[in-house]
Amino acid sequence: MVLADLGKRINSAVNNAISNTQDDFTTSVDVMLKGIVTALLESDVNIALVSKLRNNIRSQLLSENRSEKSTTNAQTKKLIQKTVFDELCKLVTCEGSEEKAFVPKKRKTNIIMFVGLQGSGKTTSCTKLAVYYSKRGFKVGLVCADTFRAGAFDQLKQNAIRARIPFYGSYTETDPAKVAEEGINKFKKEKFDIIIVDTSGRHHQEEELFQEMIEISNVIKPNQTIMVLDASIGQAAEQQSKAFKESSDFGAIILTKMDGHARGGGAISAVAATNTPIIFIGTGEHIHDLEKFSPKSFISKLLGIGDIESLFEQLQTVSNKEDAKATMENIQKGKFTLLDFKKQMQTIMKMGPLSNIAQMIPGMSNMMNQVGEEETSQKMKKMVYVLDSMTKEELESDGRMFIEEPTRMVRVAKGSGTSVFEVEMILMQQQMMARMAQTATQQQPGAPGANARMPGMPNMPGMPNMPGMPNMPGMPKVTPQMMQQAQQKLKQNPGLMQNMMNMFGGGMGGGMGGGMPDMNEMMKMMQDPQMQQMAKQFGMG
């Protein structure tokens, strides 16, 4: 996502200010604001909106700093982060959007009409929204009322078939209002919950287009009218949305092509200024690449803080409820099997492009930028191959039998076309996830250590009690080169694999040869700078 560059620049400006607050606070704030303002203007955010944001941040920070004469560095850091975060959220927030939000109801006919210019991604967005609601238990139908563009019905038909969504259209009828009415009557008789109507678009805002939209709207009486806007037009989105608003009085907006343009931030802020809520953003070409828009979630992902709420929502839509229940029961018993690990990997791979998932996980977006999506995807597939080569008994275990019987690793490596070292690394990752899952369970309200936090992990703005993740101020960063060097050290010291797994898994007992682990060798390895950095990342340094 090109918007990630904007996030990096804002983060850089904030982090520089945080590290220099011990000098002159006012100067540090002004330097930070210069960096933020430049980044926003280059992303095509309206200059008046940027000026307002700058003034708000500056006045709040200087006022708070004067009133709190004995603030610590940690308090100053939190103040800067929270103020910048809150003001960026305001920049993309439509006032009263929550009160205006349309919520479709099951067992009732909900008609949604789409409008917009040709080429904005309107027809594709219709299918994406149909898939979104279908996943949530609604019975959804698509109607093509675009009789102007050649191939419009074919496009919607192909998309609908691929997404397994019922559709209606006509190759002969030229009256769009009549086609829309016929389609709605058909789906009403069949008790559909949601009927989505796609309308014609034009290359320009022609009077005929607006008149056609009014005629269709008068006939079908939609519960919600959605305008689809191309995010690549930047702040010009404001003028376009106002022109449509005067004619069709739409109630919400979907912004498309947010994955490929730096001007998306400008489009969002411009639309928010028109006081029309953005309900979804398109983040790719796949039919699942539609995200519910929330100002806090958007800014969190932009700044690399992550969006755990959206991640959980996506996990729920693709995960098997019985599998999830079984995994949770295992975790509560203090057990996380290789089969649980495999199911988690398969669920993640169903969620669409890894770059979209990485934005929701704190610190992961930067890692994806360093390693690359294709390489990461290939590694995940290889992990599944390794797990597929294990027996039922092995998958239902917690991995100890591989340590007790190393020949099992050799067999799995041969069966999956990988190396013994790669099998070892997957076992180590499973142990790390087991420890994290058990820790999360222990820290639920009422459990011992419920308020415990990992050492060195700061809270992030707008996300109370949410521990920060890698790449934040004060945290060391593990680079791909460091990981490769650490892996080389493990290859050169194969006996240390047991020790690493003991360290991550809470002590699994029994060595490769049945003896005590060689702690002297372990200590030597952990004194290496690369390994120390890795240890700190996992809260062990």
UniProtKB/Swiss-Prot annotation:
This is Signal recognition particle subunit SRP54. GTP binds at residues 116-123, 198-202, 256-259. InterPro entries: AAA+_ATPase, P-loop_NTPase, Signal_recog_part_SRP54_M_sf, Signal_recog_particl_SRP54_hlx, Signal_recog_particle_SRP54_M, SRP/SRP_N, SRP54, SRP54_euk. Residues 304-541 are annotated as: M-domain. SMART domains: AAA (SM00382), SRP54 (SM00962), SRP54_N (SM00963). Disulfide bonds: none annotated. The keyword Cytoplasm applies. Transmembrane segments: none annotated. Belongs to the GTP-binding SRP family. SRP54 subfamily. GO terms for cellular component: cytosol; endoplasmic reticulum; signal recognition particle, endoplasmic reticulum targeting. It catalyses: GTP + H2O = GDP + phosphate + H(+). GO terms for molecular function: 7S RNA binding; ATP hydrolysis activity; endoplasmic reticulum signal peptide binding; GTP binding; GTPase activator activity; GTPase activity. CDD domains: SRP54_G. The NG domain, also named G domain, is a special guanosine triphosphatase (GTPase) domain, which binds GTP and forms a guanosine 5'-triphosphate (GTP)-dependent complex with a homologous NG domain in the SRP receptor subunit SRP101. The two NG domains undergo cooperative rearrangements upon their assembly, which culminate in the reciprocal activation of the GTPase activity of one another. SRP receptor compaction upon binding with cargo-loaded SRP and GTPase rearrangement drive SRP-mediated cotranslational protein translocation into the ER. It is an enzyme of class 3 (hydrolase). Keywords: Cytoplasm, Endoplasmic reticulum, GTP-binding, GTPase activation, Hydrolase, Nucleotide-binding, Ribonucleoprotein, RNA-binding, Signal recognition particle. PROSITE patterns: SRP54. Residues 1-303 are annotated as: G-domain. It is found in: Cytoplasm; Endoplasmic reticulum. Residues 442-489 are annotated as: Disordered. GO terms for biological process: SRP-dependent cotranslational protein targeting to membrane; SRP-dependent cotranslational protein targeting to membrane, signal sequence recognition; SRP-dependent cotranslational protein targeting to membrane, translocation. Its EC number is 3.6.5.4. It comes from Saccharomyces cerevisiae (strain ATCC 204508 / S288c) (Baker's yeast). Fungal signal recognition particle (SRP) complex consists of a 7S RNA molecule (scR1) and at least six protein subunits: SRP72, SRP68, SRP54, SEC65, SRP21 and SRP14. Interacts with SRP101. Pfam families: SRP54, SRP54_N, SRP_SPB. It comes from the Eukaryota. Signal-recognition-particle (SRP) assembly has a crucial role in targeting secretory proteins to the rough endoplasmic reticulum (ER) membrane. SRP is required for the cotranslational protein translocation for ER import and preferentially recognizes strongly hydrophobic signal sequences. It is involved in targeting the nascent chain-ribosome (RNC) complex to the ER and is proposed to participate in the arrest of nascent chain elongation during membrane targeting. SRP54 binds to the signal sequence of presecretory protein when they emerge from the ribosomes.
